[in-house]
C-alpha cells in the first residue's frame, strides 16, 4: 500500500539514514488490496481486477457476464443476481487466494453490491489475498467508511488482523482519514491496540505526520508515553517524520521529553540523527522548554504568570492601553522631527515586550492576531476617548453644544455596552454531547441518512453540525449561524450575538462622527497659543494644532477607524437584508444542482430509493466518496492579505462585486434562507429576543417563525429552492471581519 510506505524522512541522506539511526519503522501493509495506489471509484476509475491479479492469473479471458469478480467490481447487481439464480456461483465463492466478490465490491466502493452480497450470505470476515485481509480492511485502505460501516453492522470483527498483524484501526490510521477513525473508535476498539511490532495507532499517526489523527487519538485517551518493541514512543516517531503540529500536540499531552529507546536514544538524539532538530527546538520553545527540554526559568518568578492563559489574556488586552497613550503623548509633546522616530522606537519596544511575553506564554498566543491584543487596541481607543472627553471636551462644550453632548454620551454608552456584550457573550456554541454513547447514536443516525461527512459532522466537537454552523479553530467550538471570528472583539460572531455586533458597529459609526464634531468645536473654542512655533505647518494651521495636540491626534486616530467601520457596517447591513452571514458571503452556498430525474433514476437502480440524497450515492451508483469532502491545500497569503481580512476590505469588495455582477439574477447561487429584503430585515430587527440581555441559545427568527439554529439540520420546507441547501463546509481560512 503506497500510503504505508516509509516517508522520505526515513531515507535521509548521508549519515541520517534509517539504517544509521537504528530505528525499525513500521512496515507497510501489503497484499492484494495494496497492490496499486489508492483510487476513488468513479465512472472511469476503479480498482481493476486485471491490475491486481498476480502473474499466475490465466491468460484466458472470461466473459463479463460470467466473471463474478468483475461483476462485483463494477457493481452490476442484476448480473450478480443472475449468476446466483443460475447456480453458477455463491456469495461465498473465493479464488485460489481466498479473495471473495465482497472484497472487490468493498475496495471499489460499491455499496449496493456489498449490501446484496451480504444479504446473499457472504462472509464479512472472510480473509484473502497476500495480506490475508478481510473486506473491511480492503475498504479501510481506500477510506470507504460507508462500506466499513455496512460491514461492521453485519458482524465484521474490527479486531481481526492481517498476516502482518495490522487490524482495521492501524490500516485506517495509515491513510489518515479522520472520519473513518471516528467510526472505528466508536466500535470499542482499544485505542492503544498494537500491531506485531508493538506500534499503536498514535505511533502510526505521528509517524505518518497526521496532526488531526494525532489529536483524535490523544483526545480519545491514547497513551503518549507508550513504547513499541524498540522502545520508541509516539514522540520519537513524530520526530522521525518531522511534523511540528504532531510534536506539539504530543508534548501538550504530557509526553516524556527524555524517554529513551532500547538503545538509549532520546527524542533529542532522534531529532539530530533524522535532521529534524529545528522542529524539536521550535516545539520545545513553543511549549515553554529550553533547548535541553527543561522548563524555562523566567526572572523574578514570572514563569507561572506568563504561562497562565487567563493572566496573559488580560495582559494582551490592556497592553495597547499603554501603547496608545505613549505614542500619542510623544507625538503631542515633542518636536515632530524627534517625535516620529521616538514614537516608532516606542512602538517597536512595546511590541517587542509583547512578543517576548508571547514567546514564553501559552502556545496559542504565538501569533499576535490570536491574542486579545487587537481587542485591546479598540478598548484602549475607547478608554482614552472617554478620558479625554470627560476631562477636556465635556467641560468646554456642555453649555454650547448640549444636544451634541447628549447624543455622544448615548451612542458612546451603547457602543461600549454592545462591544463588551459581543466580546463576552456566548456567540452560539453548539452544545456538545454528554457521552460517547450519545456520539455513537448520532454517528449511526448520520450513516442512516447518508450524511456522515464534514458538512454534517465535526470530528473536533464530535457533534452533528447544524445548518449554517462552522467549527472555529480559534474558539475550538462549532458556532451556530457562524458569521465570522472577529479579532477586534476576540470572539466569534454567531446567532447569539450577531444583532448586538451589528448594533455595536452602527453605534460606533455614529459615535465617531459625533465625537469628531464635538472635538472640532472644542478645539476651535480654545484660545490660540501666544507664539505658535511649527517646523512644517503654516501659522494658521499651526495655531489650531497646538491648542490641544493630544486630542487632535486622537481625532486623527479614530477618524482612521471610521474607514473600516463604515465598510464593515455596509457589509453587515447588506447581509442582513439577504439573511446571509459573512462566511456564506465569502464562500458561497453549497448547492446540489444535478437534474432531479437523472439523480432519481441512478439512485433507484442502485439503492432501491428514488432519492439520491437518501441513498448517498453518486450518479454511477457507487457509495459516498470520502475524498470529495476533503478541502485542498490553502495558502494564507502575505501580510497585506491578512490585514485586508482583519480590516474587512476583502469582505466589502466581495459584497460590492456581488451586487454589481452582470448577468441575470437567477445565475447567482440562490440562498434558501432568504425571504426577501423586508422579511429578512423584520426577522433580524424584530426578533423577540431582548436587545439588552441574553437570548435563548440558538434561537432566531426565520420567515416570521422562531427557529433554533442549534438544532436545525434540515432547511425549512418553505425555504426549499431548486437545489438542496447544504451547510457550508468548514475550512481553516484566515479570520474574516
UniProtKB/Swiss-Prot annotation:
ANK repeats: 97-126, 131-160, 164-193, 197-226, 230-259
Gene3D superfamilies named in the record: Ankyrin repeat-containing domain
Domain DHHC: 456-506
Compartment(s) of residence: Early endosome membrane; Golgi apparatus membrane
Biased composition (Low complexity): 7-38
EC number: 2.3.1.225
Cytoplasmic side: 1-314, 357-372, 424-500, 571-737
Segments on the Lumenal side according to the record's topology features: 394-402, 522-549
Residues forming coiled coils: none
Transmembrane segments: 315-335, 336-356, 373-393, 403-423, 501-521, 550-570
Region called Disordered, residue ranges: 1-60
SUPFAM superfamilies in UniProt: Ankyrin repeat
Enzyme class: transferase
MF (Gene Ontology): protein-cysteine S-palmitoyltransferase activity
Reactions performed catalytically: L-cysteinyl-[protein] + hexadecanoyl-CoA = S-hexadecanoyl-L-cysteinyl-[protein] + CoA
Keyword annotations: Acyltransferase, ANK repeat, Endosome, Golgi apparatus, Lipoprotein, Membrane, Palmitate, Repeat, Transferase, Transmembrane, Transmembrane helix
InterPro entries assigned: Ankyrin_rpt (IPR002110), Ankyrin_rpt-contain_sf (IPR036770), Palmitoyltrfase_DHHC (IPR001594)
Mode of membrane association: Multi-pass membrane protein
Pfam families: Ank_2, DHHC
Residues in the signal sequence: none
Family: Belongs to the DHHC palmitoyltransferase family. AKR/ZDHHC17 subfamily.
Biological role: Palmitoyltransferase specific for casein kinase 1.
Protein name in the entry: Palmitoyltransferase akr1
UniProt source species: Emericella nidulans (strain FGSC A4 / ATCC 38163 / CBS 112.46 / NRRL 194 / M139)
Name of the gene: akr1
Amino acid at each position: 500500500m503506497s500510503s504505508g510506505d516509509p516517508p522520505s524522512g526515513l531515507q535521509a541522506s548521508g549519515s541520517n539514514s534509517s539504517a544509521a539511526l537504528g530505528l525499525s519503522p513500521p512496515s507497510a501493509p501489503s497484499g492484494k488490496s495494496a497492490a496499486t495506489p489508492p483510487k476513488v471509484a468513479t465512472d472511469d476509475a476503479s480498482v481493476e481486477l486485471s491490475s491486481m491479479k498476480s502473474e499466475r492469473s490465466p491468460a484466458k479471458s472470461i466473459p463479463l457476464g460470467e466473471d463474478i469478480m468483475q461483476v462485483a467490481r463494477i457493481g452490476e447487481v442484476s448480473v450478480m443476481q443472475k449468476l446466483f439464480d443460475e447456480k453458477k456461483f455463491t456469495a461465498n465463492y473465493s479464488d485460489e487466494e481466498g479473495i471473495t466478490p465482497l472484497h472487490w465490491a468493498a475496495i471499489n466502493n460499491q455499496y449496493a453490491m456489498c449490501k446484496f452480497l451480504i444479504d446473499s450470505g457472504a462472509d464479512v470476515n472472510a480473509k484473502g489475498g497476500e495480506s490475508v485481509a478481510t473486506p473491511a480492511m480492503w475498504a479501510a485502505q481506500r477510506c470507504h467508511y460507508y462500506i466499513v460501516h455496512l460491514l461492521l453492522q453485519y458482524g465484521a470483527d474490527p479486531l481481526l488482523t492481517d498476516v502482518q498483524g495490522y487490524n482495521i484501526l492501524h490500516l485506517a490510521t495509515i491513510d489518515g482519514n479522520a472520519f473513518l477513525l471516528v467510526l472505528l473508535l466508536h466500535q470499542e476498539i482499544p485505542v492503544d491496540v498494537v500491531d506485531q511490532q508493538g506500534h499503536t495507532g498514535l505511533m502510526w499517526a505521528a509517524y505518518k505526520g497526521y496532526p488531526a489523527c494525532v489529536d483524535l487519538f490523544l483526545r480519545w485517551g491514547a497513551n503518549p508515553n507508550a513504547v513499541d518493541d524498540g522502545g520508541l514512543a509516539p514522540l520519537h516517531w513524530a520526530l522521525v517524520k518531522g511534523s511540528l503540529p504532531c510534536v506539539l500536540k504530543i508534548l501538550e499531552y504530557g509526553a516524556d521529553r527524555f524517554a529513551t529507546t532500547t538503545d538509549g536514544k532520546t527524542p533529542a538524539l532522534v531529532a539530530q540523527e533524522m535532521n529534524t532538530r529545528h522542529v524539536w527546538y521550535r516545539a520545545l520553545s513553543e511549549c515553554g522548554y529550553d533547548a535541553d527540554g527543561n522548563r524555562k526559568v523566567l526572572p523574578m518568578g514570572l514563569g507561572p504568570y506568563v504561562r497562565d492563559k487567563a493572566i496573559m489574556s488580560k495582559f494582551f488586552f490592556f497592553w495597547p492601553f499603554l501603547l496608545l497613550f505613549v505614542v500619542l503623548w510623544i507625538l503631542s509633546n515633542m518636536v515632530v522631527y524627534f517625535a516620529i522616530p521616538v514614537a516608532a522606537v516606542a512602538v517597536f519596544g512595546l511590541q517587542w515586550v509583547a512578543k517576548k511575553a508571547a514567546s514564553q506564554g501559552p502556545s496559542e498566543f504565538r501569533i499576535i492576531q490570536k491574542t486579545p491584543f487587537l481587542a485591546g487596541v479598540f478598548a484602549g481607543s475607547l478608554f482614552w476617548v472617554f478620558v479625554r472627553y470627560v476631562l477636556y471636551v465635556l467641560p468646554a462644550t456642555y453649555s454650547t453644544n448640549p444636544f451634541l453632548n447628549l447624543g455622544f454620551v448615548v451612542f458612546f454608552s451603547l457602543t461600549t455596552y454592545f462591544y463588551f456584550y459581543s466580546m463576552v457573550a456566548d456567540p452560539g456554541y453548539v452544545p456538545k454531547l454528554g457521552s460517547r454513547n450519545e456520539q455513537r447514536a448520532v454517528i449511526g443516525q448520520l450513516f442512516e441518512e447518508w450524511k456522515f461527512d464534514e458538512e454534517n459532522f465535526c470530528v473536533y466537537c464530535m457533534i452533528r453540525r447544524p445548518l449554517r454552523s462552522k467549527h472555529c479553530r480559534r474558539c475550538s467550538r462549532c458556532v451556530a449561524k457562524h458569521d465570522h471570528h472577529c479579532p477586534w472583539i476576540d470572539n466569534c460572531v454567531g446567532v447569539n450575538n450577531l444583532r448586538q455586533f451589528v448594533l455595536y458597529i452602527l453605534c460606533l459609526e455614529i459615535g465617531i462622527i459625533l465625537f469628531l464634531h464635538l472635538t472640532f468645536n472644542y478645539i476651535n473654542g480654545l484660545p490660540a497659543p501666544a507664539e505658535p512655533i511649527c517646523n512644517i505647518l503654516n501659522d494658521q494651521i499651526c495655531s489650531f494644532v497646538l491648542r490641544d495636540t493630544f486630542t487632535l491626534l486622537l481625532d486623527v486616530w479614530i477618524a482612521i477607524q471610521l474607514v473600516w467601520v463604515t465598510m464593515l457596517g455596509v457589509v453587515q447591513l447588506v447581509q442582513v437584508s439577504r439573511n446571509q452571514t459573512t462566511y456564506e458571503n465569502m464562500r458561497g452556498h453549497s448547492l446540489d444542482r444535478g437534474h432531479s430525474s437523472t439523480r432519481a433514476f441512478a439512485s433507484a437502480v442502485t439503492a432501491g430509493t428514488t432519492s439520491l440524497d437518501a441513498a448517498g450515492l453518486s450518479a454511477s451508483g457507487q457509495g459516498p466518496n470520502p475524498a470529495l469532502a476533503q478541502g485542498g491545500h490553502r495558502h494564507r497569503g502575505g501580510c497585506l492579505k491578512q490585514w485586508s481580512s482583519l480590516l474587512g476590505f476583502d469582505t466589502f469588495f466581495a459584497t460590492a462585486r456581488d451586487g454589481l455582477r452582470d448577468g441575470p439574477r437567477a445565475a447567482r447561487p440562490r440562498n434558501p434562507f432568504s425571504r426577501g429584503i423586508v422579511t429578512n430585515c423584520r426577522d433580524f430587527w424584530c426578533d423577540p429576543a431582548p436587545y439588552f440581555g441574553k437570548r435563548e441559545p440558538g434561537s432566531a427568527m426565520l420567515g416570521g417563525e422562531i427557529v433554533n439554529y442549534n438544532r436545525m439540520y434540515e432547511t425549512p420546507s418553505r425555504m426549499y429552492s431548486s437545489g438542496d441547501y447544504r451547510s457550508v463546509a468548514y475550512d481553516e481560512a484566515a479570520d474574516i471581519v
